[in-house]
Amino acid sequence: MKKKLHPILKKIPLVCATCKKQHVIDTTVENIHIEICANCHPFYVGKQNFTTVAGRVDKFNKRYQNKVK
């Protein structure tokens, strides 16, 4: 059999950016970044989490609401 054929697996901590929960996985890469995991994803949790980010129209209205009055 050939030696050094298979990549070396190592355990790395994987931290969710949303809920900050840490998962340990086996992988060949050095680091992995995830934005959302199964613990906080609305599909798996069963409820909607709204993170309100102002859209372009909201930013425009907020900027010019004092000038109209």
From Swiss-Prot:
It comes from the Bacteria. The keyword tRNA-binding does not apply. GO terms for molecular function: rRNA binding; structural constituent of ribosome. Belongs to the bacterial ribosomal protein bL31 family. Type A subfamily. Keywords: Ribonucleoprotein, Ribosomal protein, RNA-binding, rRNA-binding. GO terms for biological process: translation. Binds the 23S rRNA. InterPro entries: Ribosomal_bL28/bL31-like_sf (IPR034704), Ribosomal_bL31 (IPR002150), Ribosomal_bL31_A (IPR027491), Ribosomal_bL31_sf (IPR042105). GO terms for cellular component: ribonucleoprotein complex; ribosome. Part of the 50S ribosomal subunit. The lineage of its organism: Bacteria, Bacillati, Mycoplasmatota, Mollicutes, Acholeplasmatales. The gene is rpmE. This is Large ribosomal subunit protein bL31. It comes from Phytoplasma mali (strain AT). It holds the Pfam family Ribosomal_L31.
